[in-house]
Swiss-Prot record:
SMART domains for this protein: EFh, S_100
Protein name: Protein S100-A15A
A GO term from the CC aspect: cytoplasm
Gene that encodes the chain: S100A15A
A single GO BP: endothelial cell migration
Domain named EF-hand: residues: 53-88
Amino acid sequence: MTDTPVEESLFQIIHCFHQYAARQGDMETLSLQELQALLMDNMPRFMDSLGQKEPYYVTELFQATDKNRDNQICFDEFLYILGKLVKDYHLQYHRQLCARYCAQHSLY
């Protein structure tokens, strides 16, 4: 049986995490630099659309997520980041839908 698109996406997320984690030190954690590279390389339009392409956004996200303050993001912490990004993307999605709807149904 083949993987569903969602299953394939999950495997790709896991692979991506390990691919970037392997760049420096521990293969099971991301440094700030690895996280920045992962997000900028894999979500450039998304980060740009949120107006959060500046490094401080990723730095603040990293610091807020690194609960044990070891300057590394483990996979569980990375999942928290993904959840936040998905929420932000969902909000952006609705803003775009609303803008299109309002443009099509303008009273002016």
